[in-house]
């Protein structure tokens, strides 16, 4: 045996790495580079380097650059569970003196393809060893061509990569520090929220606590709805401009927020956009019949032929947040939803990069996609009994003004979890949901929206009242269930400009 060999039984990491023959020794001068060549199952460490600050790394996500101002060990590895699979993962390890003894895995967004370095750095700054994965491909967040002819890569993206990365990261942590992490958490938003629920539903032994923000859990319904919505906007006479979105949002707030900018209780809002319909004397910016038809779809959601809801609709008042996601900002551009939905049906389902939505029949398309990949991609199983039985804790959150994933989809899932658990009281022992007024997709929006989380703005304080990861940690380690979470509103959503206000969030309902 060359190097150190790691054996993982199920989801449990047992023992310490065995010292084998070759270049590694107990007296290795650099414990970071000594990790190179570590093998455990289908995973192997390819690179391990001690990083001295300042360290800067670019990420395709939101075209941001992450800066790390503390030393750490950067580990890069590859997992090949079957032919055609190549899952890249990274583990960032703070010095032993700064390690809090815990581990945080972080999720992705869109179709993944790269790592969210900012989330890894934020976790490490709080003392965690952190990990992330590209989920088995290097494509852009809206590019799914890697799926054509490769069902094994779809399996990696859907559920396998995030699970195997958890096992690999825990092995690396145990070898590097000489002891395993005492507690393991996962945090994700958007597709990362879907990944989080995959872990809770299918691999409950991987993590002690999980944060699932705005989860893209009903993946097939979301992508079907994205294409259907794009077609509604492309109908003759439809022209939902940015100016119209502003007018609709203002009218919704006037009807349901009493003059405030944010609708505090969208479930109680009864807003009819027909009040803005064009008449003979209407001002420019009024809504055409085709505009109103598109709005009815976006508010009402996706249904099957019998009228059963496949995906609930978006929240009145959120319309300003639809720009880019639902309505493109510039002529000739495609919205994020259209790009993601088209990529899914072209590359996952039709496996034809020239596919177009011409003749798209949403109920039929949904049924076909669900039959092919629903079991691999959807994280909608409400039975979390195995996760609860081993003491797992789950925090869900979702912004009411989310323009990418309808907030009511998470509400529906939460209610299903409550029912499966035997009622709200039993469910409250292991799962809490925080609905965030005025928050858009994973953050931002006009409401108070900063409490940490992947893609979110950092909390002003890393305590259990202001930071969602700290809240989860207190619940898991100390048994202090989160009864409130303070969301902060920074001026212009910029922490450097100071705090403009706060909103106290309480568990739903």
PLM regions: where:
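A catalytic-pocket lid/entrance helix-loop region that shapes and gates access to the active site
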Residues: 198-200, 205-303, 435, 449-466
């Amino acid at each position: 045996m060359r190097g150190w060999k790691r054996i993982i039984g199920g989801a449990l990491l047992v023992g310490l790495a065995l010292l084998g023959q070759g270049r590694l020794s107990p007296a290795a001068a650099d414990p970071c580079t000594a990790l190179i060549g570590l093998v455990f199952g289908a995973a192997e460490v390819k690179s391990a380097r001690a990083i001295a600050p300042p360290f800067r790394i670019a990420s395709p996500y939101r075209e941001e650059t992450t800066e790390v101002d503390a030393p750490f060990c950067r580990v890069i590895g590859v997992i090949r569970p079957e032919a055609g699979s190549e899952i890249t993962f990274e583990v960032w390890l703070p010095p032993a003196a700064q390690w809090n003894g815990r581990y945080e895995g972080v999720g992705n967004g869109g179709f993944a393809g790269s790592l969210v370095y900012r989330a890894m750095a934020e976790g490490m700054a709080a003392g965690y060893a952190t990990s992330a994965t590209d989920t088995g491909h290097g494509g852009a967040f809206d590019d799914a061509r890697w799926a054509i002819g490769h069902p094994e890569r779809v399996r990696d993206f859907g559920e396998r990569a995030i699970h195997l990365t958890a096992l690999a990261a825990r092995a690396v942590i145990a070898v590097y520090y000489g002891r395993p992490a005492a507690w393991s958490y996962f945090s994700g938003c958007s597709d990362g929220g879907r990944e989080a629920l995959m872990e809770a539903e299918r691999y409950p032994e991987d993590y002690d606590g999980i944060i699932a923000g705005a989860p893209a859990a009903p993946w097939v319904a979301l992508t079907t709805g994205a294409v259907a919505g794009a077609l509604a906007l492309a109908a003759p006479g439809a022209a939902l401009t940015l100016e119209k979105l502003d007018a609709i949002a203002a009218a919704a707030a006037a009807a349901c927020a009493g003059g405030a900018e944010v609708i505090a209780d969208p479930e109680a809002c009864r807003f009819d956009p027909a009040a803005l319909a064009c008449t003979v004397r209407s001002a420019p910016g009024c809504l055409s019949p085709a505009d109103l038809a598109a709005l009815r779809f976006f508010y009402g959601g996706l249904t099957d032929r019998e009228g059963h809801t496949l995906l609930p609709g978006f929240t009145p008042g959120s319309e300003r947040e639809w720009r880019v996601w639902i309505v493109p900002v510039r002529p000739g551009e495609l919205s994020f939803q259209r790009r993601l939905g088209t990529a899914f049906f072209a590359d996952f389902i039709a496996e034809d990069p020239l596919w177009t939505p011409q003749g798209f029949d949403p109920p039929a398309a949904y049924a076909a996609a669900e039959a092919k990949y629903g079991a691999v991609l959807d994280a909608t199983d409400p039975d979390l009994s195995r996760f609860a039985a081993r003491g797992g804790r789950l925090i869900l959150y979702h912004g009411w003004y989310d323009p990418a994933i309808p907030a009511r989809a998470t509400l529906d899932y939460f209610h299903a979890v409550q029912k499966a658990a035997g009622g709200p009281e039993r469910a409250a022992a292991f799962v809490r949901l925080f609905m965030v007024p005025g928050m858009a997709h994973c953050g931002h929006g006009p409401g108070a929206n900063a409490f940490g989380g992947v893609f979110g703005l950092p909390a002003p304080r890393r305590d259990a009242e202001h930071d969602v990861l700290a809240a989860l940690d207190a619940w898991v380690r100390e048994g202090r269930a989160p009864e409130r979470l303070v969301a902060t509103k920074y001026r212009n959503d910029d922490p450097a400009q100071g705090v403009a206000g706060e909103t106290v969030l309480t568990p739903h309902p």
